Design a protein with these regions (language model features):
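Extended beta-strand/beta-hairpin segments
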Residues: 1-45, 52-127
Length: 127
């Protein structure tokens, strides 16, 4: 699943040359590296949600995050243009222990709203 790759970063992992957006969890904002296609935007939604939820859940657990980078990619069936899946990776810059970081990542994988919605599927209708 290496197609349609995107990257979002915050803190010490901001994306050089990426587009910057304000972010409620970091003063410097979030940077995004992605092309503007439907596939990239779908993957960006998942990656951006995971990044946000890492900061949200870390605050609740008392885990300091100095930087977060989330990458996501996936494929599409060229006959139906249905997603063939999305894979994402996480890098953390944190003084927290490896165990605390792993627990944070597991928690976010359970609660991140966009990945959960994609996993569950949802009807999309034109109005």
């Amino acid at each position: 699943m290496d197609g349609f790759a995107v990257v979002v970063g915050a803190g010490s992992f901001r994306v050089e040359g990426g587009v910057r957006f304000p972010h409620r969890w970091t003063a410097e904002g979030v940077s995004v590296g992605a092309e503007f296609t439907g596939a990239h935007l779908l993957h960006l939604a998942a990656a951006g949600c995971v990044l946000n939820d890492l900061y949200r859940e870390a605050a609740g657990l008392g885990v300091r995050l100095d930087g977060v980078r989330v990458t996501a990619s996936g494929g599409f069936d060229t006959e139906s243009w249905a997603s063939t899946g999305i894979a994402y990776g996480i890098e953390l810059d944190s003084p927290a222990s490896a165990e605390q970081q792993a627990a944070l990542i597991e928690q976010v994988d359970r609660v991140a709203e966009i990945p959960r919605a994609i996993r569950a599927g949802a009807p999309v209708e034109r109005r």
